[in-house]
C-alpha cells in the first residue's frame, strides 16, 4: 500500500536567496536516490519559508521494484581449462551467486565471451531506502555560506531546530547534528508558537496554514502580490512592478502583511532610480507610482505578522528609510561636485581584469571600436557623440552612489552628465550602453548607446577568450553568454550591417598589446575562431527557440558574418520548408551538395566551360543556372531571400533531369570535371541562402 513521505528541516531564519536552491537540492537528491533504488512514487511538492525547508512525496511504493539483471563473471577462457573443466574462477563465481557452474550462461561482449548469470535482485523496503535517502538529502544541501553552532560537527545555513521525517504515520530515523527526527513541526514564531504534532504527511500544509504559515511558496507569493496591490490601490497609487523584489520578500515572511508608509516629498528631486534602489536594496520596500508612472512619496513594507499598532510600526519603517534617503542625498550632492570628465583618469586605478588592464584601458579600446563600428554600420555622423559618451561611459564607477549601489551604474552616469552640462545625447548613451541588462530588457533607443554597448561587450568577449578564460559548462564568471546574446540582440534590433568577423578582428587588434604574451593550450583554436564559434553557438540556441534546428544549422553553415542578412535568410527558409512540396526540393539540392562535397575538392577552380557540355540536359541546366544566378544575385543584394529561394527552387526540374539523364562521373576526365564544376557553381548559388545538406528532408515533409 502506497504511503506519502514528508521531510521538513526546521531552522532559524534562513536567508531568502538560499531557500529556492536548497529546495532544488533536496528534491533532486530525494528523487534521484528513489529512482536509483527503483522506488516508485507520485507527485513531489516542495515547501519553503524562512524557518523551514520541506519535501512532500506522494504515493511512495512499499518497496523498490524487483528486477532480473545479468551478472558477468570471468572470461570464458579463464573459466575452463584445456580439458573443458571449470577453473577456480568459474567455481567461485558460481558459488558467489549460489549456483552450480552448469547453471551459468555465456554472454558475448565487445571484449569477448564471458560467463554470465541472470539473477533476481529484490527491491529494498521503502523505509530502508528512505532512511538513507533523507540522511543524504539533508546533508547534501549546498549553501553559498553555511555555519556551525554549539558542539555540532556539521553545518547548515542556520542552526537546525527540528526535523520531521514521516513515511505514512511512521517516523523515519534521521539525525542531523544534535537533532533527531520526529513528527512535531512548528507554526508561526509569534502567532502560533506551540508545537504541532503531525499524524501523516497529508496534514502538513493545512496544519501550518491553521498555525499562520503559508508554506507553499507559490501560494505565498500570490498572496503577497494580491495584498500589496490592494494596499497600493487603497493608498491611491499603483505598485511599481518588480518581480525580483516580490521573489525576495516572499521568502522573507511566512505570512505576508503589508503596510503603507510615506517619505518626505522633498526627496522626489533625487533621481527616481535612486529612491527605488534605496527602498529596494536596503529595506525591501515596494515603490508606488501614479497612473502616469511617476514615483510617489509612498512605499509598502511587508511585515511577517499582522500589524496591531500600524502607526507605531510605520514610524519604525519611516525612520529607517529617512536615514537611507539622507545617505542617498549626500552621495548625490557630493558626486555632482566633481564633473564626470574629471573622474575618467581615476578609472586607471580600477582593475577590470588582471591581464587585460584597468577600466581606463578598457574605455580607450571600446571607444575606438565603437567609432569604427559606427562607420561600418553607416552611422559615421554619430562619431562625436559616440566618442564623448564612450569616454564618460564608466566614469560613474568611481562615484559614491555607484559604490553604494552598483545596480545604478550608467543611470548615475546619465544624471551626472546632465548635471555637468553634457548634451542629452551623450547622457542618454551613457545610460543606454548597459542595455539590454537581461533577456527581457528593452534595447537602446539611440545608436550611440547601442554601438558603445556592442563595443564594450565585444572587447570583453575577445579579451577573455584571448587570455584563455572562456566560459565552461559550469562557470561563466564574466557573463560572456549574456554579453554575446546582448550583442546579437543589439545588432538585429538596430539593424546594423557590418562584418562580425571584421569587428572581432578590430577588437583583437586593439587588444594586441595586452594579449601578445597570453598562453594558450596546444592545438587550441585562435581567439578569433573561438569567439566566432561562440557567436555561432549562441545564435543556434537563440534561433532554435523559434525555428527548426536543422533549418538554423543550414543557415549558419552558409555563414552569419552579416547577422541581419542571416536572420532574413532564416525567416525565408523557415517559411518555405513548411510547404508540402519542399521535400523533393530538399532531396534534389542535397544530391548537388553531396557530390560537391565528395568530388568538388578534386576539381580545379574556375567556371563551367559551356563548350564541354555535350548532353542537352546539362546544357539546359547550365542555361537555367546562368539565368537564375543573375536574378538571385540581384535579389540577395536587396535582402529578398524569399524571392531568391523561389528562383533557386525553379532549378529543380533541370536538376532532376540532369541527374536522370547525365552521368556525372563520366570516364572522360574533362567531361567529368566540367560537370562537377557546374554542380559546384550551383552549390555556391544555393549557399547564398543556406547549406541545404543540413536540412532533414523527412522532417520537411512532415512540417
Curated annotation (Swiss-Prot):
Any single GO BP term = arginyl-tRNA aminoacylation
Q: Please write the reaction equations for the catalytic activity of this protein.
A: tRNA(Gly) + glycine + ATP = glycyl-tRNA(Gly) + AMP + diphosphate
**Major location (coarse):** cytoplasm
Q: Which organism is it from?
A: Myxococcus xanthus (strain DK1622)
Q: Which GO terms describe its molecular function?
A: arginine-tRNA ligase activity; ATP binding; glycine-tRNA ligase activity
Q: What family is reported?
A: Belongs to the class-II aminoacyl-tRNA synthetase family.
Q: Which GO terms describe its cellular component?
A: cytosol
**What is this protein called in UniProt?**
Glycine--tRNA ligase beta subunit
**What gene codes for this chain?**
glyS
Q: How does it assemble?
A: Tetramer of two alpha and two beta subunits.
State the compartments where it is located.
Cytoplasm
Which HAMAP family does UniProt cross-reference here?
Gly_tRNA_synth_beta
The organism's superkingdom is given as Bacteria
Which SUPFAM superfamilies does the annotation name?
A: HD-domain/PDEase-like
Amino acid at each position: 500500500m502506497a504511503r506519502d513521505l514528508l521531510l521538513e528541516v526546521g531552522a532559524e531564519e534562513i536567508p531568502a536567496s538560499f531557500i529556492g536552491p536548497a529546495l532544488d537540492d533536496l528534491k533532486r537528491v530525494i528523487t534521484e536516490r528513489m529512482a536509483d533504488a527503483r522506488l516508485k512514487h507520485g507527485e513531489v511538492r516542495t515547501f519553503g519559508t524562512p524557518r523551514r525547508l520541506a519535501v512532500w512525496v506522494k504515493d511512495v511504493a512499499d518497496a523498490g521494484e524487483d528486477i532480473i539483471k545479468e551478472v558477468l563473471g570471468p572470461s570464458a577462457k579463464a573459466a575452463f581449462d584445456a580439458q573443458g573443466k571449470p577453473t577456480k574462477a568459474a567455481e567461485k563465481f558460481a558459488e558467489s551467486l549460489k549456483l552450480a557452474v552448469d547453471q551459468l550462461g555465456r554472454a558475448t561482449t565487445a571484449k569477448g565471451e564471458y560467463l554470465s548469470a541472470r539473477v533476481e535482485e529484490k527491491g529494498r523496503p521503502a523505509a530502508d531506502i528512505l532512511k538513507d535517502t533523507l540522511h543524504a538529502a539533508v546533508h547534501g544541501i549546498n549553501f553559498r555560506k553555511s555555519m556551525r553552532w554549539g558542539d555540532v560537527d556539521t553545518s547548515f545555513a542556520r542552526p537546525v531546530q527540528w526535523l520531521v521525517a514521516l513515511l505514512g504515520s511512521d517516523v523515519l530515523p534521521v539525525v542531523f547534528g544534535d537533532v533527531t527526527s520526529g513528527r512535531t513541526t512548528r507554526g508561526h514564531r509569534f502567532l502560533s508558537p506551540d508545537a504541532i504534532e503531525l499524524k501523516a504527511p497529508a496534514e502538513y500544509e493545512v496544519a501550518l496554514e491553521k498555525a499562520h504559515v503559508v508554506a507553499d511558496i507559490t501560494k505565498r507569493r500570490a498572496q503577497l502580490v494580491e495584498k500589496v496591490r490592494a494596499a497600493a490601490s487603497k493608498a491611491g497609487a499603483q505598485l511599481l512592478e518588480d518581480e525580483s523584489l516580490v521573489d525576495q520578500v516572499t521568502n522573507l515572511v511566512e505570512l505576508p502583511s503589508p503596510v503603507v508608509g510615506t517619505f518626505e516629498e522633498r526627496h522626489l528631486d533625487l533621481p527616481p532610480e535612486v529612491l527605488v534602489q534605496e527602498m529596494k536594496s536596503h529595506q525591501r520596500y515596494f515603490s508606488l507610482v501614479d497612473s502616469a508612472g511617476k514615483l510617489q512619496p509612498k512605499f509598502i513594507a511587508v511585515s511577517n505578522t499582522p500589524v496591531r499598532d500600524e502607526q507605531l510600526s510605520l514610524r519604525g519603517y519611516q525612520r529607517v528609510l529617512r536615514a537611507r534617503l539622507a545617505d542617498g542625498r549626500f552621495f548625490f550632492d557630493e558626486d555632482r561636485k566633481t564633473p564626470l570628465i574629471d573622474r575618467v583618469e581615476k578609472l586607471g586605478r580600477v582593475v577590470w581584469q588582471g591581464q587585460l588592464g584597468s577600466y581606463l584601458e578598457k574605455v580607450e579600446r571600446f571607444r575606438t571600436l565603437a567609432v569604427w563600428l559606427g562607420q561600418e554600420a553607416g552611422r559615421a555622423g554619430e562619431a562625436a557623440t559616440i566618442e564623448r559618451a564612450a569616454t564618460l561611459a564608466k566614469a560613474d564607477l568611481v562615484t559614491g552612489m555607484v559604490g553604494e549601489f552598483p545596480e545604478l551604474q550608467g543611470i548615475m552616469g546619465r544624471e551626472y552628465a546632465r548635471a555637468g552640462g553634457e548634451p542629452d545625447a551623450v547622457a542618454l548613451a551613457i545610460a543606454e550602453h548597459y542595455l539590454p541588462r537581461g533577456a527581457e530588457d528593452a534595447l537602446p533607443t539611440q545608436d550611440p548607446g547601442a554601438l558603445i554597448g556592442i563595443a564594450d561587450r565585444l572587447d570583453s568577449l575577445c579579451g577573455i577568450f584571448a587570455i584563455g578564460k572562456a566560459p565552461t559548462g559550469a562557470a561563466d564568471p564574466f557573463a560572456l553568454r549574456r554579453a554575446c546574446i546582448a550583442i546579437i540582440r543589439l545588432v538585429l534590433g538596430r539593424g546594423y550591417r557590418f562584418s562580425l568577423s571584421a569587428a572581432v578582428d578590430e577588437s583583437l587588434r586593439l587588444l594586441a598589446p595586452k594579449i601578445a604574451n597570453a598562453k594558450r593550450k596546444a592545438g587550441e583554436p585562435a581567439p578569433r575562431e573561438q569567439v566566432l564559434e561562440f557567436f555561432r553557438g549562441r545564435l543556434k540556441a537563440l534561433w532554435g527557440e523559434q525555428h527548426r534546428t536543422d533549418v538554423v544549422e543550414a543557415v549558419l553553415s552558409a555563414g552569419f558574418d552579416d547577422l541581419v542578412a542571416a536572420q532574413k535568410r532564416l525567416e525565408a527558409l523557415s517559411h518555405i520548408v513548411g510547404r508540402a512540396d519542399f521535400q523533393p526540393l530538399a532531396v534534389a539540392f542535397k544530391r548537388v551538395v553531396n557530390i560537391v562535397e565528395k568530388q568538388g575538392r578534386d576539381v580545379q577552380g574556375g567556371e563551367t566551360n559551356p563548350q564541354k557540355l555535350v548532353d542537352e540536359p546539362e546544357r539546359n541546366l547550365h542555361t537555367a543556372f546562368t539565368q537564375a544566378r543573375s536574378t538571385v544575385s540581384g535579389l540577395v543584394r536587396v535582402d529578398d531571400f524569399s524571392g531568391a529561394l523561389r528562383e533557386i527552387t525553379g532549378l529543380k526540374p533541370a536538376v532532376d533531369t540532369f541527374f536522370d539523364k547525365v552521368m556525372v562521373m563520366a570516364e572522360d576526365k574533362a567531361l567529368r570535371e566540367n560537370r562537377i564544376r557546374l554542380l559546384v557553381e550551383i552549390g555556391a548559388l544555393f549557399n547564398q541562402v543556406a547549406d541545404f545538406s543540413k536540412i532533414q528532408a523527412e522532417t520537411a515533409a512532415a512540417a
